[in-house]
Amino acid sequence: MISVCEDFNGVFGRNAARMRDICQKIGALPDVNKIVLFGSYARGCAQSESDIDLAVFFDCQDARLLGRYRQLARICVNPVIDIQVQPFHTYELATPCGIIEEIETYGLELRVY
């Protein structure tokens, strides 16, 4: 089950403000349902060279997902931190397999208000 995280400072340390800004921009995109951190940062074992893995779940038609991915890629380009972002449909959470299983098990939903 995906846990909720609102403590950006505790998770991202010195990159907290940048990540909050990036998540706010992602959250402003049409059809975004949730932003989930997964990988080493979510498991609490990130190293200085670790990338930041984000899964963004959308409520949109398949035809729109490619466009949303392009928007995500533009938002997440950052010279300071390595962000790897993947778009998914929310229906993929209903029967998780593969990477969705990891996201479901270890993921932290990043909420920004």
Please name every model-derived segment.
Residues 1-34, 43-48, 58-113:
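Catalytic core of pol beta-like nucleotidyltransferases
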